[in-house]
Amino acid sequence: MAERANLVFHNKVIDGTAIKRLISRLIDHFGMAYTSHILDQVKTLGFQQATATSISLGIDDLLTIPSKGWLVQDAEQQSLILEKHHHYGNVHAVEKLRQSIEIWYATSEYLRQEMNPNFRMTDPFNPVHMMSFSGARGNASQVHQLVGMRGLMSDPQGQMIDLPIQSNLREGLSLTEYIISCYGARKGVVDTAVRTSDAGYLTRRLVEVVQHIVVRRTDCGTIRGISVSPRNKNRMMSERIFIQTLIGRVLADDIYIGSRCVAFRNQDLGIGLVNRFITFGTQSISIRTPFTCRSTSWICRFCYGRSPTHGDLVELGEAVGIIAGQSIGEPGTQLTLRTFHTGGVFTGGTAEHVRAPYNGKIKFNEDLVHPTRTRHGHPAFLCYIDLSVIIESEDIIHSVTIPPKSFLLVQNDQYVESEQVIAEIREGTYTFRFKERVRKYIYSDSEGEMHWSTDVYHAPEFTYSNVHLVPKTSHLWILSGGSCGASLILFSIHKDQDQMNIPFLSVKRKSICSLSVNNDQVSQKFFSSDFSDKKKSGIPDYSELNGIVGTSHYNLIYSAIFHENSDLLAKRRRNRFLIPFESIQEQEQEKEFMPHSGISIAIPINGIFRKNTIFSFFDDPRYRRKSSGILKYGTIEADSIIQKEDMIEYRGVHKFKKNYKMKVDRFFFIPEEVHILPESSVIMVQNYSIIRVDTRITLNIRSQVGGLIRVERKKKRIELKIFSGDIHFPDKTDKISRHSGILIPPGRGKPNSRESKKVKNWIYVQRITPTKKKFFVLVRPVATYEIADSINLATLFPQDLFREKNNIQLRVVNYILYGNGKPTRGISDTSIQLVRTCLVLNWDQDNKNSSLEEARAFFVAVSTKGLIRDFIRIGLVKSHISYIRKRNNPPDSGLISADHMNPFYSISPKAGIQQSLSQNNGTIRMFLNRNKESQFLLILSSSNCFRMGPFDHVKYHNVINQSIKKNPLITIKNASGPLGTTIQISNFYSFFPLLTYNKMSVIKYLQLDNLKQILKVINSYLIDENGRICNRDPYSNVVLNPFKLNWYFLHQNYHHNYCEEMSTLISLGQFFCENVCIAKKGPHLKSGQALIVQMDSVVIRSAKPYLATPGAKVHGHYGEILYEGDTLVTFIYEKSRSGDITQGLPKVEQVLEVRSIDSISMNLEKRIKGWNKYITGILGIPWGFLVGAELTIVQSRLSLVNKIQKVYRSQGVQIHNRHIEIIVRQITSKVLVSEEGMSNVFLPGELIGLLRAERTGRALEEAISYRAILLGITRASLNTQSFISEASFQETARVLAKAALRGRIDWLKGLKENVVLGGGIPAGTGFNKGLVHCSRQHTNILLEKKTKNFCLFEEDMRDILFYHREFFDSSISKFERSFLGFNDS
């Protein structure tokens, strides 16, 4: 009784963890027998109390957490803000998805943590609480779904469903939540069935690998160990894991604290000793593990350590391999059952945050960080090395170290409040997460035209397609507008920016705008209008060519151009772009008439022509053939010239064709029908047979002409030709027939006819020899082409009115596009152009102007009597200016800079258009389509544009409309002029050019002195293609600049010929995001593009921005029309797989089967080469490789152990490291024999044990080359020393056949092979104590060797080799002898 009085009475609730700890202490103090007696009493007590309590469970016991309401409300608020950011184009869809998941995941986790304290305070004896937290039934996550919130669910692929279930099962689910819940729960049910079988198979493979590992010796005598220290370079190891790692291990080295030895080598560690190490703060402790054991196919007691069952050193004969395999496999079977209850609820992970401890100012070194975006799209700083951040408050200075690759979310010198998040530690910094690459497709919400605000380049695997890569973060814009496709004729009189009545605008996908019967009169009216009467007709006159008076040294080439190509500069990112001429109609000379699609002008993208470049080309329809054939030049050969300038690239790649310059005035075309068929096609005609027209050649092809059939079989295809013509069998006397392939002019007789008929046309004679003896002649018809006289330039381009000196000449050159005797092949339903007429630009080289080596092309918009016309002007420039292509980014704009302003954007003022703009009216914007047959028009109706203004700080003369002032955002309706603006030019007495400078030459001032007449503009102005506006009002000295929405006053003493350009505030074509404010008190803009800039207001075409980050793939070309639902962008991002054990088990399997998880970095090979070079340089050849191989193996072993442990720990499963180490040791202990050397012992490519390879090398006293290799558990099972064990696992026939051929011997060392053959197993009682004998003497020698301060780099190399030999001879030889003796007996 006296003893009991000293006992301390603890009145405390203990949970499962505390009971575990109590039992382990009891075993340490009292041993197994007494402990089991105590535990029996505890069990009886527990059952008594449980029976007395009799817990009941009712629905009222499920108490919802009170803080849930405002937590969910807060998460919804954050989601709403996120949605707005996405709408404004600040974050893209992937960032939005990520952040949304993290918001809801954090809310759900917080609710789960609140649950336990809530129960403990309000109702500690709540049956739900008692059951789940005692571990009797259910766990925290299941109870959380009952009383917290069900949260985010995974779909069957393990992907997240981003709509969270906010209710819990107690409150009940809404219909949507119920469907999502069933979706996830089904995944749980299916997974359970599949994973159970997977887990069983995993256990079988694991046991297979390690079944032969038995404890067969007390000490293998190794001098190696693995050091464990509580403080690592990167992080602190938690005390719990540190204790778990050390308990039950055996020390590999003596441990000193100061000069005192506290523990000696080969001593096993108990809890007392480990606690003493922690107290004294020992730096590193070297322990023995299965990795360090020197035994080849079993393990020694010291390297294994204590047995987990009874807490003493493991007994000899214990089958530790099978225990290890089952310890790892068994939790897999258990854990699969857990998923059933949680029902596919998503369990992910969020990043850790560093918070400020109190209010203060942040200070850090800005040179060590650089700006970036977080994965949620927030601005942040990324630090590459450890960054010290100092928080200064009034009286304290606190320093925080932020690890590398973390995000700093605050700026330098920023004031932070207490608990504010200042940094985010990246999730993947310390933890091992299985990531997968996922593609996310973003689809267009609306129909419209695609623009982008930065240069993009082609994705490497899609060089010639419409997939582009985004190099830096930028916006993609979809400009609104309905598309309408039609033939060229219907809209040929409408130009860009015209207004027209849209009779029928189909919004359906890719439909063609069709005019109904009722609207025929409307279209008729367009065409029959009298073009001379410009006032009445709503259509401006485009059919005549107007001359232009030139007042400078430029030469003007006169032609109106199609305006739909006005944004070609932005679209074509190739060498040059095309502008087709408008149709040129000459009434008198019908010969000269050319279709307007025929002539194309090729202008380089920088607008600069070199000498002798092709300026324009024309494909004459007379030289066009539908059929295939052969081209012959007749007698005179032509020079082959290749001019790379002749090829125009258009949406794809073209190989440069050879062009043949003509010296002949005629050439011949011999037609033939050619079919190229696949190998497998059935041909229904014979070679050298004669067929009629419309004969069936194959199942679905009929011949177009009749004649002789030739069938040639080539690689993977059959070429079938049909030659039309007459067949003649010549006499021996005919000489001509011997020459095959000649042309015979008209007037000559046929070579073999007895009657001398005259040949009317040219013919082509071809000799055909079906067999050696037999031949005949085929006479084929020939089409003759004469090269016509060159086109008269005067008809194409009117003469210069001022009769100036002509610097620039145009030469007409004809090119034949195919060589002599070359076959021409047409693709189906296309015609072949044989001759191309080109205009070549040339000019005289003056001595004075020797620097004028280039011509520059300009676009000019000139207006006469209310009509605006577009011209190309080609002028000579000095070459040194031409390469300066500078963009003027205004410093003070504060808005989007004018980088992506369209250089060829022009707004055409037309006096004649006075239609009222009703709902069904629209403005045409043409754009280039790949299909040349039809044009697509983009029609902007009034719903696509809105008007901003007037702006208060702008001074203007005439107030346009009082009603506009009251409501700044007005949809444009029923105002006159294009898009509701009255544009009218009066006082245009005579007609003169408006000189403009192209953007490429940077000129600071706009010259206005050429304007002899006063240009008076009422509320409107002229705009050229650069978006510049010239406005001279003599009364006010005001120059309106389009780039600023304000006026610029000229001083009286200012030189009157120049007005200065000012920086831009709003420029044409500029993009705005939503809610940007331009003027100080002006309204907030909607997102869009500035279409019309007026004195006091701006018209904006609505547009939707999409954010694209680097590496995103854009589908489509610049300026292309996209329809609703088209794929716009593909984002590729890394995503952590959810940490459910349903995904966890495959992770373990993935590691054990050594499948690669992450993509390997490209420069890994370079690093390995570098490492090999340096280490061999330091240590010399043999030792360098040895150390390198050893380090590789050790490092990969430790890494594999940590990865597997991490997966199990994340599920709350504790597995001792030594079980995993035994498995990992087996999959890393094989090496692959290389080609060089060792040929007399092992075959190249053979897998042998690492220790065996080392010993063989020492025995042979020669270098042995092998590579360390990681084998998966399946391959390791099929590469053991026992072929019986391998055959009983998989591929029985193959393994046995191979073993028989090689004459393998099975020594029956493992358990499995003995079971198969019905013998006793060499483990437990069947383990023969006399099997291994190690004398005391040898052990002493080893210990003496160890006490010498042995270091690899201090002793002589010879000593080390000697030591190795002696060590192995002493420890191995006797054991080998005894083992062989045992087997013989």
From Swiss-Prot:
Catalytic reaction equation(s): RNA(n) + a ribonucleoside 5'-triphosphate = RNA(n+1) + diphosphate
InterPro entries: DNA-dir_RpoC2_beta_pp (IPR012756), RNA_pol_beta''_euk (IPR050254), RNA_pol_Rpb1_3_sf (IPR042102), RNA_pol_Rpb1_4 (IPR007083), RNA_pol_Rpb1_5 (IPR007081), Rpb1_funnel_sf (IPR038120)
One GO BP annotation of this record: DNA-templated transcription
Cellular compartments annotated: Plastid, Chloroplast
Record bears the keyword Nucleotidyltransferase: yes
E.C. designation(s): 2.7.7.6
Note on cofactor: Binds 1 Zn(2+) ion per subunit.
Record's keyword annotation contains Transport: no
GO cellular component: chloroplast; DNA-directed RNA polymerase complex; mitochondrion
Reported cofactor(s): Zn(2+)
Pfam family, one: RNA_pol_Rpb1_5
HAMAP family listed in its UniProt record: RNApol_bact_RpoC2
Protein task: DNA-dependent RNA polymerase catalyzes the transcription of DNA into RNA using the four ribonucleoside triphosphates as substrates.
Protein name as it appears in the record: DNA-directed RNA polymerase subunit beta''
Originating organism: Aethionema cordifolium (Lebanon stonecress)
